């Protein structure tokens, strides 16, 4: 059987030959192609603009001839072997990397491995310096190891590069997942923190509102109580001064303030000592109170009541003076003021308050004295009852100690 040679021609070659030699009866003669202005396209260029080969064949039905009567060309063995060899060689050339690139990439790990050692030896000034037999042997062994590693990397280039690529890919995916998880976690943390801060701000605002509300109510009550107290004070003063002369009362209070200022000024200047200040303050207060009572021309029973209240006020003054004197003698070093200054102010305010209170409610000091006596009596009675109970407890303990031993044994058997 003879080997016949048939030229390999594809349908694309036939189409090109047709386009070159034949004229399409439907489309007419080929137009001239002007490449300068680009206004006229190449002949039958619609087939070139189609990306799908099926669409290209649809426009030209003679492009892919599937007639069963057409017999395929008889290819020879030589042509088949040459075609297979060309395809195999072209595929190998496409899949393999260039030789220099393989050498370069294989040498990079060796270079990276030796750079730290060279840098360290250079830093220690020991690179190829004073090398002996052992050092050169170590150097040769190291070079041999590096050469073996280089050869291994070059021979197994495809394997380790794919492994490195997979490692890099896995690392990148892992880092991406870590970044994603971190971002999500941070977003969740920010969200939770924002909600927590919002709740804290809400609770704080509510608490502040409650505090402001309570404070406002408390201040309103304080203002109310203060206004009521001032109103009562005004009422007390108006009732106390109802039957006396207004001009005389004003003069008396002005004289009282002048006397007190002179008294405290003299005491502060050192011209009066403690005892003189006590006597002067007591006498001044008594004189002023007596002047107020005697200048209004009140009935005798009212005068007697005022004198009684004045005596009670003087008694309270004496008690306060004794207490202040004792405290000053014990804690005098811890006070900035001296004793007579404190006593003078105490006497001034106490006398004024008690006098006005006695004028508003006659006999209140007497009732206060009786109430104080009752309280002291109650306290003393409680102390007496406590001592009586303690005495009874000790008496019962002594009675138990006097029981005979025989009676105690009988009680134990029972």
Swiss-Prot record:
Record keyword Membrane present: yes
Keywords, in A-Z order: Cytoplasm, Endoplasmic reticulum, Membrane, Toxin, Transmembrane, Transmembrane helix, Vacuole
Compositional bias of kind Polar residues: 57-72
InterPro entries listed in its UniProt record: WTF (IPR004982)
Region (Disordered): 1-94
UniProt record, GO biological process: meiotic drive
Transmembrane segments: 99-119, 136-156, 170-190, 192-212, 222-242, 247-267, 284-304, 311-331, 339-359
The keyword Transmembrane is annotated on this UniProt entry: yes
Biased composition (Basic and acidic residues): 11-29
Domain of life: Eukaryota
Gene Ontology CC annotation, any one: ascus epiplasm
Similarity field: Belongs to the WTF family.
Subunit structure: Homomer. Forms protein aggregates. The two isoforms can interact with each other and with themselves. High sequence similarity is required for their interaction.
Stated role: Promotes unequal transmission of alleles from the parental zygote to progeny spores by acting as poison/antidote system where the poison and antidote proteins are produced from the same locus; the poison component is trans-acting and targets all spores within an ascus whereas the antidote component is spore-specific, leading to poisoning of all progeny that do not inherit the allele.
Protein name in the entry: Meiotic driver wtf19
Organism: Schizosaccharomyces kambucha (Fission yeast)
Gene label: wtf19
């Amino acid at each position: 059987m003879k080997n016949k040679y048939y030229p390999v021609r594809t349908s694309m070659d036939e189409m090109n030959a047709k386009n070159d030699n034949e004229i399409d009866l439907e489309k007419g003669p080929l137009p001239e192609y002007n490449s300068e202005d680009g206004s006229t396209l190449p002949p039958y260029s619609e087939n070139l603009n189609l990306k799908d080969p099926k669409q290209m064949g649809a426009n030209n039905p003679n492009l892919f001839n599937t007639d069963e009567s057409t017999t395929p060309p008889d290819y020879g063995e030589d042509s088949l072997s040459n075609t297979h060899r060309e395809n195999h060689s072209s595929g190998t050339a496409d899949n393999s990397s260039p030789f220099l690139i393989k050498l370069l990439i294989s040498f990079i790990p060796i270079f990276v491995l030796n750079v730290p050692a060279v840098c360290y030896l250079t830093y220690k000034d020991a690179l190829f310096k004073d090398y002996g037999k052992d050092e050169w042997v170590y150097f040769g062994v190291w070079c041999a190891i590096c050469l073996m590693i280089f050869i291994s990397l070059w021979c197994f280039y495809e394997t380790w590069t794919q492994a490195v690529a997979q490692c890099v890919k896995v690392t990148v995916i892992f880092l991406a997942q870590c970044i994603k998880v971190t971002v999500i976690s941070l977003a969740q943390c920010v969200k939770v923190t924002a909600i927590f801060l919002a709740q804290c701000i809400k609770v704080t605002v509510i608490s502040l509102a409650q505090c402001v509300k309570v404070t406002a109510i408390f201040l309103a009550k304080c203002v109310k109580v203060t206004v009521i107290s001032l109103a009562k004070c005004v009422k007390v003063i108006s009732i106390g001064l109802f039957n006396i002369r207004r001009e005389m009362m004003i003069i008396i209070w002005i004289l009282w303030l002048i006397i007190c200022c002179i008294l405290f000024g003299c005491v502060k200047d050192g011209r009066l000592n403690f005892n003189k200040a006590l006597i002067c303050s007591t006498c001044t207060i008594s004189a002023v109170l007596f002047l107020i009572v005697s200048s209004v021309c009140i009935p005798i029973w009212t005068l007697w009541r005022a004198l009684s209240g004045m005596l009670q006020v003087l008694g309270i003054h004496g008690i306060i003076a004794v207490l202040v004197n004792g405290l000053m003698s014990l804690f005098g070093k811890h006070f900035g003021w001296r004793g007579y200054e404190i006593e003078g102010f105490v006497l001034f305010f106490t006398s004024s308050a008690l006098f006005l209170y006695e004028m508003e409610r006659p006999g209140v000091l007497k009732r206060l004295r009786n109430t104080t006596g009752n309280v002291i009596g109650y306290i003393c009675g409680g102390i007496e009852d406590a001592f009586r109970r303690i005495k009874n407890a000790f008496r019962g303990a002594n009675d138990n100690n006097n029981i005979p031993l025989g009676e105690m044994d009988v009680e134990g058997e029972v």
